[in-house]
Amino acid sequence: VLDELTADR
C-alpha cells in the first residue's frame, strides 16, 4: 500500500 506511505498522516 504505497498510498499509506505517501499519506504523511
UniProtKB/Swiss-Prot annotation:
Highest taxon of source: Eukaryota
GO (cellular component) term, any one: extracellular region
Subcellular locations according to the entry: Secreted, Cell wall
Primary location: secreted
Keywords noted in UniProt: Cell wall, Secreted
Protein name: Unknown protein 1
